[in-house]
Every structure is written in structure tokens, then in C-alpha cells.
A protein has these predicted regions:
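Bacterial Sec-dependent signal peptides at the C-terminal "C-region" and cleavage site
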Residues: 18-30
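Bacterial N-terminal signal peptides that target proteins for export
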Residues: 1-9
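Bacterial N-terminal signal peptides
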Residues: 8-19
Length: 172
């Protein structure tokens, strides 16, 4: 809330200096990260990822292709990993993990996760072009670099944020 208040004050000062009144629309739009702020190249790559993973809205398809339940993470959802895809490469069209939420009438695909073992590289691997996205280091179990993308459920924290406030914080 503090950053939003500071932001609101800055907007008001700018509006006074520019001679216009602040509006609710401009304040709330600026307070939310938007996909539109990503580069054209990044948006193109996200479209490739969506096209490649759209088939996994049908969970049976993901199951048939080797994605298996790993765990539930509050704010991330139910994570299914295809272990045959875990290697030393970042492949936009073949995410190592899929994130689902259970809406009571089946699973809903909400995002993907790219995974590169730390044994492959001591520094974060390359990711989406033209972004300042930081891979997350996870040391539990197999030490990995992880990069999440909220492809199918908008995340007000940002496309590549670790957690999505729209995803339940409690696991079943």
C-alpha cells in the first residue's frame, strides 16, 4: 500500500504541474503491471508458449504426455512436471511444468514453469527475450532455476511473478 500511496501522490503532483486532474482510470491502470509493457518480442514468445500449451487445457492430454503431479504450492497451484523435459535448455514451447487449479469441476490450466537444473549452469539461464525477468533459485530437492509465466490466468503481480494472488493460498 505504501508504494501505491507514493505513486498516487506522484500522479497528483504530475497532474497539477501538467494542468490536468487525475482520474481513477489512469491511477488504477498504472498501478497494475500489464502485458502491454513487455516488448513485442516477449509478447510474440508468450504467444508461442500459449499456442504450444493450449492443448493442456485438456488435463488428460497433459497426463498422456507425461506430466505428473509433483506438489501443490500456495499461490502457484497444483504443479505437474514432465521429467523427460527437465534438461539444460530453456524451450519456450516445452515447459517442464504446468500449473493448474482445481475449480471443483476439473482442473484449469493457469500457467507454466520452466526449469533448468543448477548443475547445468551456475548462473540463471537465458529466458524470454527482452525481459528483465529473474529466474528463481530453488534449493529444495533438486536445486533448480525456475521461471513461471502466468499464461492462462492474469496475474496482477506481473506475467513472470513467482506467485499469483488469484490462485488459492491454501492447498487441498
Amino acid at each position: 500500500m505504501k508504494s501505491f500511496s507514493t505513486f498516487s501522490i506522484l500522479i497528483a503532483i504530475c497532474c497539477v504541474l501538467l494542468g490536468s486532474a487525475p482520474t481513477t482510470r489512469s491511477t488504477s491502470a498504472a498501478a497494475k503491471p500489464a502485458v502491454e509493457n513487455l516488448s513485442a518480442v516477449t509478447n510474440h514468445e508468450l504467444a508461442l508458449a500459449r499456442n504450444a500449451t493450449a492443448k493442456y487445457h485438456d488435463f488428460d492430454r497433459a497426463d498422456d504426455e507425461g506430466y505428473e503431479f509433483l506438489h501443490c504450492v500456495p499461490g502457484e497451484g497444483l504443479e505437474y512436471v514432465n521429467w523427460s523435459l527437465v534438461d539444460c535448455t530453456f524451450d519456450i514451447e516445452h515447459p517442464e511444468a504446468l500449473h493448474y487449479i482445481d475449480e471443483g469441476n476439473g482442473l484449469r490450466l493457469v500457467g507454466v514453469e520452466y526449469v533448468v537444473p543448477v548443475a547445468c549452469t551456475a548462473t540463471p539461464p537465458e529466458g524470454f527475450t527482452g525481459t528483465d525477468v529473474e529466474w528463481e533459485f530453488e534449493a529444495e530437492g533438486l536445486p533448480i532455476w525456475a521461471l513461471r509465466a502466468a499464461l492462462w490466468l492474469p496475474n496482477r503481480e506481473g506475467m513472470f511473478a513467482e506467485h499469483n494472488p488469484s490462485i488459492p493460498t491454501q492447498c487441498p
